Amino acid sequence: KAIVWQDRRTADRCGELASELPLVRAKTGLVLDPYFSGSKMEWLLVHGNVPVSPNLALGTIDSWIIWNLTHGASFVTDASNASRTMLFDITTMHWSTELCSMFGVPMHALPTVVASSGRVGETAASAGIPAGIPISGIAGDQQAALFGQACFETGSSKNTYGTGSF
């Protein structure tokens, strides 16, 4: 099951948590908003008929793609994606027990956070994809766009206009 970034069904829940904004801001640098996936994960657990089990896996699109390419051998993400969940502490660079508890997200269900560069697994044989192809590098779309637009110098900036503007 998946809920995309534009989905606002958790707006009321984020409103209920308004008093927690200082904690969320301090841990994540984010505002409480349904754009981020923490409240969506909570929604799936509460309303989406997703049972908590030892095998539960909750992640972002990168972790889902890698998990599928490796047939479940690698369940990973990087900080650029984890930091957009409202569950990742950008100071400690780990999942936050406080934020996971606030949203009712079991920490065992979250992917391992790894470096953005480096090998994270290899493909398993599947329809049209041979086994053993290295999977290297993870980055969120806008973080990757920074490199794609050659912003390599301090002070460089970029702007992307599409379904969202960043």
Language model regions located:
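ATP-dependent carbohydrate kinase catalytic cores
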Residues: 80-166
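Active-site phosphate-binding/coordination module
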Residues: 1-41, 141
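N-terminal glycine/serine-rich phosphate-binding loop of ATP-dependent small-molecule kinases
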Residues: 1-4, 26, 54, 128-134
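Phosphate/pyrophosphate-binding loops at sites that engage ATP/ADP/AMP, CoA/4′-phosphopantetheine
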Residues: 47-53, 68, 97-107
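Residue-level signal for inorganic ion chemistry
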Residues: 7, 44, 99
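Short beta-strand-loop/turn "lid" adjacent to the catalytic site in phosphate-handling enzymes
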Residues: 1-5, 31-35, 42, 66-89, ...
